[in-house]
């Protein structure tokens, strides 16, 4: 019995475009890639992006790779090139309180659905970065390390990362002292030290253990003082 999609599709390839090309040759295009940014942060939004690239070389995207391997400058330079050259792209965001209400995994999966639904081109196949996503409008495949294995996922990774980083830089102006523009809401020593001094702001995720523990200590201290 022949597996479907073809086995070549699910192997991690040496070239970023091999996965998309194999799917398109099998009649399953256009192919959308989906990825997120901010899943592990204790502050700021969860941002999810979807992107469809045509199965052809893009000289302007020659540096495209897993966004975590790229410098901030390179990501910023790639962002307008991706939005200009992509067949379709979409970015959705969940603020901290919504991540708390839904749970980060549920928000991530729902974000992937919404990002794909927001594409102006309906994909024939969807590649997600590591997560199985039920309820998509097309067949899909989770790819471990997908942002390093498929160009459309790498492009979505850059879109999500740059979009979120820009929000965090603006948030640094609204909530000074935490260093959001530097650490982007992740649990760095500097961020944790600022949290101890300033306490959580409205952009911190109350469901995160370190934020919840700090709030618990503050509540106990307030209770003891009364």
From Swiss-Prot:
Secretion signal span: none
Organism in which the protein naturally occurs: Rhodococcus opacus (strain B4)
Designated name of the protein: Ribonuclease HII
HAMAP family in the cross-refs: RNase_HII_B
GO MF term list: manganese ion binding; RNA binding; RNA-DNA hybrid ribonuclease activity
Binding site for a divalent metal cation: 35-36, 129
Gene3D superfamilies: Ribonuclease H-like superfamily/Ribonuclease H
EC number: 3.1.26.4
Keyword Manganese (UniProt): yes
């Amino acid at each position: 019995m022949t597996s479907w999609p073809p086995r070549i599709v699910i192997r991690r390839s040496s070239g970023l475009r091999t996965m998309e090309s194999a799917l398109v040759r099998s009649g399953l295009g256009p192919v959308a890639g989906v990825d997120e940014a901010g899943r592990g942060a204790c502050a700021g939004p969860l941002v999810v992006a979807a992107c469809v690239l045509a199965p052809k070389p893009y000289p302007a995207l020659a540096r495209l790779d897993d966004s975590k391997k790229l410098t901030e400058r390179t990501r910023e330079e790639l962002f307008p090139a991706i939005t200009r050259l992509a067949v379709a792209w979409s970015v959705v965001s969940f603020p901290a309180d919504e991540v708390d209400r839904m749970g980060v995994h549920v928000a991530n999966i729902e974000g992937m659905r919404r990002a794909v639904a927001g594409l102006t081109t309906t994909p024939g196949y969807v590649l997600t970065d590591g997560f199985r996503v039920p309820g998509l409008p097309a067949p899909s495949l989770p790819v471990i390390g997908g942002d390093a294995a498929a160009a459309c996922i790498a492009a979505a990774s850059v879109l999500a990362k740059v979009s979120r980083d820009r929000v965090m830089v603006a948030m640094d102006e609204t909530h000074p002292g935490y260093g959001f523009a530097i650490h982007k809401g992740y649990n760095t020593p500097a961020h944790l030290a600022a949290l101890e001094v300033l306490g959580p702001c409205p952009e911190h995720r109350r469901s995160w253990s370190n934020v919840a523990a700090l709030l618990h200590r503050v509540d106990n201290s307030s209770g003891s003082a009364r």
